[in-house]
């Protein structure tokens, strides 16, 4: 299943590289990071003694984490060598049965005999397959040396003594090299201690990176635009998870995000938006105007760049990005003009582009009143398309009203809502910025 996940993205990326599928994969694997950051996580592979054990394997750790470590290995040894190793594995075991180690041994055989750098593939992969969790790579300069060290990353910031064999791409200035971190620390001589240093260059590693303050400042300054999309995505994702783990303050994170006012990539904005949505749930009432001003300042340059209306010939991902930043501006930035334009889109059909219509739907719901709620409910009951019906249903969970969220929770358990849709509707109610706890209590009280 992990290999199938890897091939799903590899094949599509080879067919349509402009879709940036490996960047999308970087976003998708975040779910595996989240689960693997808990002490209750599990190893990717474990003995299966019952059907229940087998069922337990069908999760993000098998699919996303498993696919991610295959991608990490492929990028470290090189796609051609990886492909040759898989080919050797298939030919060697044609019409036979195999175990996991057979794949690692086949790849290791190729990289040990083709004249290239020798990599201990089985030992490397065993440290990821048979150990739960993943490492945080700390990066600092000590004198004339770059120091990389590892410890387990957990949300409660209480790592155990687990060590991994970590394949790392390090870019120092304009030169990228590969290092294998096999112990708790490795030191790399530097010819220029003032160079910009990027660890997890190109972003294939299944680990988080923690830079010292001076090294982070070098990256988030004028050189930020020189990072590729996945590198910038990982930079934000790692910083946000440092906040979740209590290793970075929310104030420091907001200051960090100010360097992204010129960001124009969907994937990076998706992690920024997710973090801002989470922050909005804990912002004190008296600080909400300041938070809204910050969001508006952060988003406005992108709104000005992309505009409100689609442009003929623009990239497919631009429409999704426009919808995302419109929601940020209108909901979290509390921009009244953006809210008005969203109402025009939804009620007057001033724009029919699907991503903007979807964004306008969420904005009107999040900023709407009881009259708007009745309109959404009516459209759900009499939709023009099945897609519109689902959009209207989920919008019922966005309203900023305890009474309306209570109605939505009750509505989820009626015969008007399909049983396969009810859990997703309740999940969205729980995710409501102001009334999530109310929805959670409803679920607890009605759990059977």
Which residues does each predicted region cover?
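Long, ordered, helix-rich scaffold segments
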Residues: 12, 28-31, 37, 66, ...
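Intrinsic disorder/low-complexity segments enriched in polar/charged and small flexible residues
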Residues: 21-24, 130, 166, 239, ...
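Residues that act as N-cap/strand-start positions at coil-to-secondary-structure junctions
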Residues: 131-133, 162, 180-184
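Short coil-to-beta strand junction motifs in C2/discoidin
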Residues: 160-166
């Amino acid at each position: 299943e992990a290999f199938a996940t890897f091939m799903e993205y590899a094949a599509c990326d080879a067919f349509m590289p402009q879709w940036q599928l490996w960047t999308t994969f970087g976003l998708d694997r975040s779910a595996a990071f989240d689960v693997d950051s808990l002490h209750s996580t599990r190893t990717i592979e474990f003995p299966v003694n019952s059907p229940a054990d087998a069922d337990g394997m069908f999760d993000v750790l098998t699919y996303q984490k498993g696919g991610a470590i295959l991608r990490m290995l492929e990028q470290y040894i090189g796609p051609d060598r990886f492909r040759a190793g898989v080919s050797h594995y298939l030919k060697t075991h044609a019409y036979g049965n195999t175990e996991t180690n057979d794949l690692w041994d086949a790849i290791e055989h190729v990289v040990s005999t083709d004249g290239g750098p020798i990599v201990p593939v089985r030992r490397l992969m065993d440290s990821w397959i048979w150990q739960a969790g993943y490492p945080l790579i700390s990066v600092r300069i000590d004198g004339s040396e770059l120091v990389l060290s590892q410890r387990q990353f957990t949300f409660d910031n209480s790592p155990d003594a687990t060590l991994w064999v970590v394949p790392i791409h390090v870019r120092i200035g304009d030169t990228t090299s590969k290092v294998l971190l096999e112990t708790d620390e490795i030191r790399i001589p530097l010819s220029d201690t003032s160079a910009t240093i990027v660890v997890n260059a190109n972003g294939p590693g299944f680990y988080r990176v923690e830079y010292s303050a001076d090294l982070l400042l070098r990256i988030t300054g004028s050189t930020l635009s020189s990072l590729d999309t996945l590198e910038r995505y990982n930079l934000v994702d790692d910083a946000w998870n440092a906040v979740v783990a209590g290793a970075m303050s929310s104030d420091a994170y907001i200051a960090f995000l100010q360097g992204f006012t010129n960001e124009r990539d969907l994937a990076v904005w998706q992690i920024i938006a997710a973090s801002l949505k989470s922050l909005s749930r804990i912002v004190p009432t008296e600080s909400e105007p300041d938070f809204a001003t910050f969001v508006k300042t952060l988003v406005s340059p992108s709104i000005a760049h992309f505009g409100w209306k689609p442009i003929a010939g623009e990239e497919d991902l631009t429409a999704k990005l426009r919808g995302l930043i419109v929601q940020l501006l209108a909901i979290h930035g509390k921009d009244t003009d953006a809210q008005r334009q969203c109402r025009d889109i939804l009620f007057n059909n001033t724009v029919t582009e699907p991503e903007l219509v979807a964004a306008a739907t969420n904005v009107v719901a999040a900023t709407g009143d009881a009259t708007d709620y009745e309109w959404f409910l009516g459209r759900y009951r009499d939709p023009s398309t099945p897609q519109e019906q689902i959009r209207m249903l989920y919008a019922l969970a966005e309203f900023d009203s305890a009474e309306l969220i209570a109605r939505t929770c009750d509505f989820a358990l009626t015969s008007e809502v399909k049983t396969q849709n009810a859990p997703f509707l309740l999940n969205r109610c729980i995710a409501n910025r102001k009334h999530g706890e109310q929805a959670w209590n409803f679920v607890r009280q009605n759990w059977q």
